[in-house]
């Protein structure tokens, strides 16, 4: 053999010997070095180089990301129990390859974990708790879930998450407690629920669990004991535009000094109600599933749709803003106490709620003809006031629609 061939065979034999003796390998990640892998796996650098001849003498060839390296030989004792802290090359890889049921090493530390996790969290003797990151989690959300440590604590224990918390990886475990961490939520209020957002008022004494479809205004109106500014001050994580409410999380709806009953000039006003409701209201109605303005008007027959929307402006002119289980004004001073006769259908918008007599428009009808039909018991001005949709010039009479031709009193 030539010297070159002899050297190559010897090198390959050494590599094969190392591979044969190796009892555990680890795939290197970007940024790994001989020193970092040796440190992570608690082995001597000289042993690491001996087990991995491809790195070259004194690690002159370096470590290649994606390549497997021996981190334990079969004569060096049992397999290391703590996984290394190298980062996966991309977040996508971490999300798609992380095990749905991570293994539990013999020392109690779960796998996988991210780079730099608190030393106290790597030992079953010191770690209080671990948490497996879920899709949609944020640092604040995790902190709020436990309520036993601060965001600063969390980032100190899990520096790989980053100061802006953009480095959380789904299906990886993060440290949520070291020796000395309280086992129950902290704060001045022992009754504070566990699922709260960051920054919630420390002196909160009343809580509300957010439901799907809730908004800050909706919650405020439901209680009617505090202002929107109060709510946002007590729950800053909701954001000024209230886009940060989390379903099934608790928000603060009362601190010392907050009224225990709805505020307002009328102690008989029910709750909840929407903003802008007339202060002259004398009677209320609780909206049911499937209600519309027209349906409410037709069932009570004492006011018009235009009157209803003027008393309850939050429903909108198109009446798309009715909320189930909220109260709406259905009477003010002067509203008839008793329903009029059953209103026929169809009728045009705005017909008076005081109508007690109707006429079905026929082909060829016009206003004067209808007035004469009733022996001039009313005039054009009255007919238009009872049926504003027909227009002042009476150009919008609809055949087969009913119009009002008589009112109460």
Swiss-Prot record:
InterPro entries, per the entry: LysM1-like (IPR052210), LysM_dom (IPR018392), LysM_dom_sf (IPR036779)
Any one Pfam family match given in the protein's UniProt record, by short name: LysM
Native source species: Beauveria bassiana (strain ARSEF 2860) (White muscardine disease fungus)
Entry function: Secreted effector that enables the plant pathogenic fungus to manipulate host defenses for successful infection. Required for the full virulence to infect insect hosts. In contrast to Blys5, Blys2 is not able to protect fungal hyphae against the hydrolytic activity of chitinase but plays an important role in evasion of insect immunities. Binds chitin. Coats and protects the cell walls of insect pathogens from host cell recognition.
Note on domains (UniProt): The LysM1 domain might affect the protein binding specificity whereas the LysM2 and LysM3 domains might determine the protein's chitin-binding affinity. The LysM (lysin motif) domains are small globular domains involved in binding chitin in eukaryotes. Blys2 contains 5 LysM domains.
SUPFAM superfamilies found in the cross-reference section: LysM domain
GO CC annotation terms, alphabetical: extracellular region
Annotated region described as Disordered, given as residue ranges: 74-111
Subcellular compartments: Secreted; Secreted, Cell wall
SMART domains associated with the record: LysM
Keyword check for Signal: yes
Misc note: In plants, chitin acts as a microbe-associated molecular pattern (MAMP) that is recognized by lysin motif (LysM)-containing plant cell surface-localized pattern recognition receptors (PRRs) that activate a plethora of downstream immune responses.
Domain (LysM) ranges: 24-71, 129-176, 206-253, 283-330, 357-405
Signal peptide annotation: 1-20
Molecular functions (GO terms): chitin binding
The name this protein goes by in its record: Secreted LysM effector Blys2
Conditions for induction: Expressed during in vivo infection of insect hosts.
């Amino acid at each position: 053999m030539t010297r070159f061939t002899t050297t190559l065979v010897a090198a390959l034999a050494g590599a094969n010997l190392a591979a044969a003796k190796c009892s555990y390998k680890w795939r290197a990640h970007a940024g790994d070095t001989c020193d970092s892998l040796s440190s992570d796996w608690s082995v001597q650098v000289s042993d690491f180089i001996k087990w991995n001849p491809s790195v070259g003498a004194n690690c002159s060839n370096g470590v290649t990301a994606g390549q497997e390296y021996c981190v334990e030989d079969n004569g060096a004792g049992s397999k290391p129990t703590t996984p290394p802290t190298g980062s996966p090359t991309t977040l996508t890889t971490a999300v798609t390859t992380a095990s749905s049921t991570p293994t539990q090493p013999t020392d109690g530390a779960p796998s996988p974990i991210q780079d730099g996790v608190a030393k106290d969290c790597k030992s079953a003797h010191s770690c209080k708790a671990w948490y497996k990151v879920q899709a949609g989690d944020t640092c604040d959300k995790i902190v709020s879930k436990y309520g036993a440590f601060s965001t600063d604590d969390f980032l100190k224990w899990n520096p790989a998450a980053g100061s802006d918390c953009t480095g959380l990886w789904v299906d990886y475990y993060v440290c949520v407690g070291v020796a000395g961490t309280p086992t129950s939520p902290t704060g001045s209020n022992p009754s504070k629920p566990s699922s709260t957002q960051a920054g919630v008022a420390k002196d909160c004494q009343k809580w509300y669990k957010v439901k799907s479809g809730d908004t800050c205004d909706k919650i405020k109106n439901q209680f009617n004991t505090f202002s929107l500014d109060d709510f946002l001050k007590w729950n800053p994580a909701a954001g000024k535009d209230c886009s940060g409410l989390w379903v099934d999380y608790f928000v603060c709806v009362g601190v010392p000094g907050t009224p225990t009953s709805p505020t307002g000039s009328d102690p008989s006003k029910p709750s909840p109600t929407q903003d802008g409701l007339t202060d002259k209201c004398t009677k209320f109605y609780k909206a049911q599933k499937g209600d519309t303005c027209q349906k409410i008007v037709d069932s009570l027959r004492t006011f018009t749709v235009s009157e209803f929307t003027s008393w309850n402006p939050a429903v909108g002119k198109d009446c798309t803003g009715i909320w189930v289980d909220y109260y709406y004004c259905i009477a003010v001073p002067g509203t008839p106490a008793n329903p009029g006769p059953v209103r026929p259908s169809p009728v045009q918008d705005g017909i008076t709620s005081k109508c007690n007599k109707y006429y079905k428009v026929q082909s060829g009808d016009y206003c004067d003809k209808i007035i004469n039909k009733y022996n001039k018991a009313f005039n054009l001005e009255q007919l238009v006031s009872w049926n504003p949709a027909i227009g002042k010039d009476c150009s919008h009479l609809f055949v087969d629609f009913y119009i009002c031709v008589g009112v109460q009193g």
